[in-house]
A protein has these predicted regions:
Chain C
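Bacterial N-terminal signal peptides that target proteins for export
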Residues: 1-9
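Secondary-structure end/capping motifs
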Residues: 224-301
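Pocket-lining segment of extracytoplasmic ligand-binding domains
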Residues: 89-90, 163-164, 169-257
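Bacterial signal peptide processing site
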Residues: 23-25
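C-terminal motif of bacterial Sec signal peptides marking the signal peptidase cleavage site
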Residues: 18-21
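Short, glycine-/small- and polar/acidic-enriched structural segments
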Residues: 27-157, 162-165, 181-187, 201-210
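Ligand-binding clefts/hinges and TM-proximal coupling segments of bilobed small-molecule sensing domains
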Residues: 140-159, 236-268, 306-310, 320-325
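Conserved C-terminal helix/tail region of periplasmic/extracytoplasmic solute-binding proteins
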Residues: 295-329
Length: 253, 263, 329
């Protein structure tokens, strides 16, 4: 409880400072609306039903893109991390595509998939795929061979190694990649929604920017931050809940 | 009488960047059924490679490795391996680590639970059954690793510097644990170490390896009476063995490190 | 004694610096950063750049292109650029938050620049068919204002269609792959859409609802600190506009190069644009109309009265340079 109070005090001080700076008219409150105004904008947008729809649309896109992207990244990373032939063929392809900043693909996604859900999910997929690929590739190709030997010498059959030894041994590295991708998913999503849409948090940020509705724009920016934070916490909670050993291993190494 | 290990003219090479490196060359040794045999040598002489070949992890480049006249093709739970770094599975609890072997061989769950409990009790780990390995001390971890292997009732126990990562007190305690276990179960044991005291204390026979690429330099039969207790370490015969082995190893160290510098 | 001499010396030095400094200002080059929104309506500025009419006014102009005047406005507000060419709608929006924006001249008027382009296979053959359709609009630009007026002229309201916010250059692709049914924009984007869709495209134009003005916009601070630079920019642009009108073929060539539209297309639409340097009553009226529209349709001006749009226009420099161009009192 004391921890919590201490942790939130920083945020509260930030809010008070922000409110004070806006109120003193040092900066035009029209350009830098105080938190009270931003919060009231958020409240009225929530009551009007617009904000929940935006959040729902954005979260759905982020989750869909994240699941597809991380599954593909995990699969390709695992296969190329463990099987020579796949490594030789796939890894150069991935390495060539990986440095392309995903934001640069936004216009291409519009040309290929239009402005609908497909292009947004595709962009999130792309953004998530590479960090998950990297972490799965590294995690799986660098699994300590002693784990495999230890398992084999107590009678674990070769075909069972994948699920019972290699994957769990690589999991801590993979989880790091997944966690990085969560914040990346939101960054990419905002960029994708800003490029063209009629629903979603990123779309509102861009639309309110263009018509100078700064309090609402800031409200949606704060909301984006909150969504990212909640997603990260939820992920951490689920990991600790389902993999109690994970935290122990991380602290150890 | 199972667990008779014979290694004949074993050579193992690895292909490096532009040349072939021999890890061991021309190693011949034997572990008879229920015998406790140690392999000592300086660091990097290829002791572990010998263990890895017998375990089935690394195929011999030349020579033969057989257990009970069967050539070794792949790892098998008849040959249990205990590693220096324990190699417990961090995603499994102590109980799950020990049960992993019988579990993957499809042993009946009830039987598994019973025998896991038995080994937990034997190793003094009953209160730590649901802990993860990361929560245990080094000595406890190595006991889990031993239990994980012994539960499969192997014929041969291959121990690769199992106490190398432990502090001196824990090490002596673990040596006694292993000796007691061996005396009650009578597995064939091949024990790799660079600690001469440990080798003499535990073994029926000690093989000394040359520096890399390792081959067998000499063999000593340790004729000390069994069962052995802590006091045997002060026995003059014990000290004689130690002295002789020490000289052998010293020669090999000098090959690797060069003569002592003169100050 | 020494002190008195020292003071004298200081006084002389200051005087010398002042005189030479002052003398230098009128001779010295002025540096101006100009942001230009890309479109056919910016043609006279393209010409001024290409012929470098800035140079003869002792101006060194750093020109930065923007996809839309609306985005140039952000840079102007942030202080990255000194002067920008922008349509009227973004300025009206911006004035609610930035009362220091100033218009120094209109360089073009047109009631045929903004258009609606739609896909026939989306079931759109007449403007009334837009009901219920997805229409791409670049929010905050004149395109948005035109789109609303167009819809209203069909007896429809904003809620009868779904507007999708898209940057103008992305509209062609979005329409081509069917993620929108229509879009509203300025040229070259409608011509580009026509080229991409061919027979499948239908274009609607309502020239009675809105006359767009394309303006040179700066901030009160920049004008107050650099009145001479502003005058020079105006003189150069006046020459650019005259040249554009006198050398139609060359002006089209220059614009073609800037926008990538073909000569034929530009020839066809060129007369839709009235290039002229003016400050007219029409500008004040269109600013006020849009101000009232924004006041009614959004809560941007909540609790505030509309700005005095006459005060937004700085007419004095243009009045000095080209008196006939100023028709506001």
């Amino acid at each position: 409880m004391r921890q919590f109070a201490l942790r939130s005090s920083g945020i509260i001080i930030l809010l008070i400072l922000w409110e004070l700076v806006s109120r003193t008219n040092l900066i035009d409150p029209g350009l830098f609306p105080p938190p009270s105004q931003v919060i009231s904008a958020l409240v009225s947008l929530t009551l009007s039903g617009q904000l929940p729809k935006d959040v729902f649309a954005s979260v759905l896109r982020a989750v869909a893109g994240f699941i597809l992207g991380s599954m593909a990244g995990l699969f390709v990373g695992a296969v190329s991390g463990r099987i020579r032939a796949f490594d030789a063929v796939l890894t150069p392809v991935v390495q060539v595509l990986r440095p392309i900043p995903v934001i640069a693909l936004v216009p291409l996604a519009i040309v290929w998939f239009g402005l609908g859900e497909t292009s947004k999910i595709f962009l999130v997929f792309w953004g998530v795929f590479f960090p998950v690929w990297v972490s799965s590739y590294l995690g799986i190709s660098r699994v300590d061979k002693n784990y495999i030997w230890a398992a084999r010498s107590i009678g674990v059959r070769r075909e069972k190694l994948w699920l019972q030894v290699i994957l769990p041994a690589a999991l801590p590295t993979i989880i790091t990649g997944l966690r990085t991708s969560i914040s990346l998913a939101f960054i990419v999503l905002v960029a994708a929604e800003m490029a063209g849409s009629y629903l979603g948090v990123g779309y509102r940020i861009s639309a309110y920017h263009l018509v100078f509705q700064i309090d609402k724009m800031m409200g949606y920016i704060v909301l984006m931050g909150a969504l990212g934070f909640i997603a990260d916490r939820t992920f951490a909670y689920l990991v600790n809940r389902t993999l109690p050993w994970y935290q122990l291993s991380v602290n150890q190494d | 009488m199972a667990g008779h290990v014979v290694v004949e003219n074993l050579g193992v090479s690895f292909t490096g960047k532009d040349k072939t490196i021999w890890a061991v060359k021309d190693v011949s040794l034997e572990v008879k059924s229920r015998e406790f045999v140690s392999l000592v040598g300086v660091s990097g002489c290829g002791k572990s490679t010998v263990i890895n070949s017998i375990a089935g992890f690394v195929p011999p480049t030349v020579g033969d490795v057989t257990v009970d006249n069967q050539p070794i093709t792949e790892p098998n739970s008849r040959r249990g391996v205990v590693f220096q770094s324990f190699v417990l599975f961090p995603w499994k609890t102590v109980r799950e680590n020990i049960a992993f072997g019988p579990h993957s061989r499809g042993v009946d769950e009830k039987v598994i639970t019973q025998s896991v409990d038995q080994y937990l009790k034997l190793m003094g780990l009953m209160n730590f059954a649901d802990h993860y390995p990361q929560q245990l001390s080094g000595g406890m971890r190595q006991r889990v690793a031993l239990a994980r292997v012994l539960i499969n009732d192997p014929d041969v126990l291959l121990m690769d510097e199992p106490f190398g990562a432990l502090d001196a007190q824990t090490r002596i305690f673990m040596q006694e644990v292993v000796l007691n276990l061996w005396e009650s179960t009578h597995k064939s044991v091949l024990f790799v170490t660079h600690d001469i005291d440990e080798a003499v204390f535990l073994s029926d026979r000690v093989y000394v390896m040359t520096a890399a690429p390792g081959s067998i330099k000499s063999v000593y039969d340790i004729e000390l009476e069994r069962p052995r207790g802590a006091e045997i370490r002060l026995d003059p015969k014990f000290l004689d063995y130690k002295r002789e082995l020490y000289e052998e190893i010293r020669e090999e160290s000098q090959k690797v490190l060069g003569p002592l510098p003169l100050f | 004694m020494i002190i008195r001499n020292f003071k004298l010396l200081l006084g002389i030095l200051t005087l010398v610096l002042f005189v030479t400094g002052c003398g230098k200002v009128s001779e010295e080059e002025s540096r101006v950063t100009l942001g230009q929104g890309m479109g056919v309506l910016n043609a006279p500025i393209f010409v001024t750049n290409e012929k470098n009419f800035w140079e003869s006014q002792s101006l060194q102009v750093d020109v930065r292109p923007f996809v839309a005047g609306r985005l140039a406005l952000d840079s102007l507000i942030a202080g990255d650029i000194d002067i920008a060419t922008i349509g009227d709608t973004p300025v009206v929006y911006g004035l609610f938050k930035h009362p220091n924006l100033r218009i120094i001249a209109t360089v073009m008027e047109s009631n045929r620049d903004e258009k609606v382009i739609a896909r026939r296979d989306a079931g759109i053959d007449s403007p009334g068919d837009l009901k219920g359709k997805r229409i791409g609009v670049f929010f905050g630009t004149a395109g948005e204002y035109y789109a609303i007026r167009f819809i209203e002229a069909q007896g429809l309201s904003r809620e009868d269609v779904s507007f999708i916010n898209i940057k103008a250059p992305d509209m062609v692709a979005a329409l081509s792959n069917g993620s929108i049914d229509a879009y509203v924009s300025w040229e070259p984007h409608v011509q580009n859409g026509l080229r991409a869709l061919g027979e499948n495209a239908v274009v609607f134009l309502n020239s009675d609802i809105y006359t767009e003005t394309w303006n040179l916009v700066t901030t009160a601070e920049f004008f107050n600190n650099n009145p001479e630079a502003v005058r020079r920019v105006l003189r150069a642009v006046v020459r650019g506009v005259e040249y554009t009108n006198a050398n139609r073929k060359e002006a089209i060539d220059i614009t073609e190069k800037q926008l990538g539209l073909s000569r034929d297309v530009l020839e066809n639409i060129w007369d839709d644009y009235d290039f002229k340097v003016v400050l007219s009553e029409n500008l004040v009226a269109t600013l006020r109309n849009q101000g009232e529209w924004i006041q009614a349709s959004s809560d941007l001006s909540k609790g505030k009265s509309l700005p005095d749009y006459r005060q937004v226009i700085i007419d004095q420099p243009l009045r000095e340079i080209l008196p006939v161009a100023v028709s506001i009192p």
